[in-house]
């Protein structure tokens, strides 16, 4: 569903008013049409009039689509690895871990800053966490968000036991990152 211009630009005014460094646009879905990308590019150009850094969580892009957004002024893209290569098939069946890594590398080659991290608490092992962090080190993103699972009713991980996610455990993971 397309967010209204009023909401999007109103949020951008707030970023400017509060002197925040960046405005992040989060989108959901797998793949966007060229028309949707052009629409987003127009909106980014409008937002850039505020001298605000723009970040977008948009999923997979073609190189053509990424260039359109780069030319519009998009600064940073969030594309998380989410997990380790070996655990990834347990949480995602629509695409592969390598597709995520390749998408990030393509975006980096076009000059985007990258925000990429993962989610802890989905049933992965400690070795999986270390493997994900080592892959992130190789990718070398500008920002590494580490998220901790909060099970949501109605989702695949709704019944996941997160008792291991104590404050101490979470701090250890963050220290490794």
What is the meaning of each model-derived region?
Residues 73-76, 169, 173:
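Glycine-rich, acidic and aromatic/proline-enriched surface loops and short helix-turn segments
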Residues 162-170:
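Generic long, charged, amphipathic alpha-helical segments
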Residues 29-34, 94, 120-125, 152, ...:
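Short, small-residue-enriched loops and turns at beta-alpha junctions
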Residues 25, 49-51, 98-156, 170-177:
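Conserved C-terminal portion of the radical SAM core fold
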Residues 67, 90, 126-128, 155-163:
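Short, well-ordered secondary-structure micro-motifs
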Residues 1-9, 15-103, 113-117, 142-147:
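Core AdoMet radical
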């Amino acid at each position: 569903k397309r967010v209204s211009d009023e909401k999007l630009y109103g949020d951008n005014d707030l970023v400017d008013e509060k002197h925040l460094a960046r405005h992040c646009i989060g989108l959901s879905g797998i793949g966007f049409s060229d028309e949707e990308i052009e629409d987003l590019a127009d909106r980014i150009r409008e937002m850039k009039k505020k001298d605000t850094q723009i970040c977008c969580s948009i999923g997979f892009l073609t190189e053509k689509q990424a260039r359109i957004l780069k030319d519009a002024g998009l600064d940073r893209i969030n594309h998380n690895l989410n997990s380790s290569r070996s655990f990834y098939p347990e949480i995602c069946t629509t695409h592969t871990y390598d597709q995520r890594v390749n998408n990030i590398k393509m975006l980096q080659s076009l000059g985007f800053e990258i925000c990429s991290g993962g989610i802890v608490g989905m049933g992965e092992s400690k070795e999986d966490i270390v493997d994900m962090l080592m892959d992130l080190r190789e990718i070398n993103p500008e920002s590494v968000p580490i998220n901790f699972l909060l099970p949501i009713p109605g989702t695949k991980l709704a019944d996941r036991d997160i008792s291991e996610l104590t404050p101490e455990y979470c701090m250890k993971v963050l220290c490794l990152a």
